Amino acid sequence: MFTREITAKDVKATEKNRIRYSSKHIKHLPPGTITEFEWKDYCPLGFRLIQELEDINHDEYMKSICNDETLRKLSTSKVGNMFLLSKDDRFLIKILRKSEIKVILEMLPGYFRHIHKYRSTLLSKNYGAHSVKPIGGVKTYFVVMSNILQSDVFMNKVYDLKGSSQGRTNKKIKVRDKTILKDIDLDFCFYVDSLARHRLIKQTKLDCELLEDEGIMDYSLMLGLQVKGSCHGSIDELIPVYDSFTSRGSVDSNSSKFMKTASNSPDRSSSTMYSCTPSRNSVDSENSVNIQSVASISPSPAQTNASDSPYESLVSKTNLTNIFQNSSSTNFGMKIPGRARRVGRGESGSVVGKQSREGGEEWYDVILYLGIIDIFQDYGVRKRLEHCYKSIQHSSKTISAVHPKMYSSRFQDFVSQIFLPDEDPSH
């Protein structure tokens, strides 16, 4: 419930806690495991307001991010090298520099006003900024965000897109064994309902205007691509749904032999974090973690909410109008139906249709999941120096390190180029 704005006093506030494993829990840990940490929350009240706005229970949030597996990974990882996912896929954790945490905090009042005013924003939700320090160790800063790609279906491809090209190819970055592809790897353009595209372009503009005003650049469009009727494997191994020489009917995903529910997905059984349940009455209970020696946390079985069909809640074209005209919708960017067209690059860099082996263009019925992530980089000294260095070697139009105004304009142009209106009356 939105009750007030985030103030400058809120932004400066911090809370410190000490996390200490119980004696019984230590017995179950490998030798040499760090068992005591200093934990710090930044702008705790401000982030609580965001959690309330997004219907995030604070106790469940803390149980998801504060467990021995997460603490171990956070205290041994380097900046930018890793994403951590909660077992229920709700939260995405990224390690940041101290300067990036500062940027998040400084923009928090304006960011909060924006996500409250525009409930269909594409911006990832920042639920908390924290630091953790093993006793005698090095402090690690991190942010907890919404997982834009949270889904009960397998993603055939996942992209991190900036609208630039220099250095924008896959560097084997993975989230839960899924390779994150980049701009150079993108060989599709997407056709979506014209109303959906209009809403997408409009919301992207509003979100980019906020980021531009806050001096933010180097953000990305996270895009998940799920082919209807497929299960696991690469989209490159699939037969196109239709091409220019076949009838343009869509595949019946419910009858496809490839259909499989998420509960049977081996990819989702290997998680980087696990959820926990509290036991405040038993501080030294087995497998507990003590926060200020008051609250203890113990592992609980993972919850599975997979339906019989991953497409039961798929947005159909008959109700697209209601969805995209409702400015209070918080699910915009999730489960957008469309068609993916395989494309290549012409000599001038323009997008051209790519021929399949049978001679027609490759098309796929897809579900799209998208949002804007990494909204914590300002155009400071480090990025200005990067711009000077790279612009000597490459065109400034192709590099990521550019002024926020130029970055915003290029990003919006890129989104409008890869998402096109689907005006095919037969689809």
Swiss-Prot record:
SUPFAM superfamilies in alphabetical order: SAICAR synthase-like
Gene Ontology MF term list: 1-phosphatidylinositol-4-phosphate 5-kinase activity; ATP binding
Location of the region described as Activation loop in the Swiss-Prot/TrEMBL record: 379-400
Reactions catalysed, as given in the entry: a 1,2-diacyl-sn-glycero-3-phospho-(1D-myo-inositol 4-phosphate) + ATP = a 1,2-diacyl-sn-glycero-3-phospho-(1D-myo-inositol-4,5-bisphosphate) + ADP + H(+)
InterPro entries according to UniProt: PInositol-4-P-4/5-kinase_C_sf, PInositol-4-P-4/5-kinase_core, PInositol-4-P-5-kinase_N, PInositol-4/5-P-5/4-kinase
SMART domains: PIPKc (SM00330)
Gene3D superfamilies, per database record: 2-Layer Sandwich, Phosphatidylinositol Phosphate Kinase II Beta
Signal peptide: none
Keywords: ATP-binding, Kinase, Nucleotide-binding, Transferase
EC nos: 2.7.1.68
Residue ranges of domain PIPK in the record: 1-419
GO biological process: phosphatidylinositol metabolic process
Spans annotated as Disordered: 247-287, 334-355
Protein name as it appears in the record: Phosphatidylinositol 4-phosphate 5-kinase 10
Organism: Arabidopsis thaliana
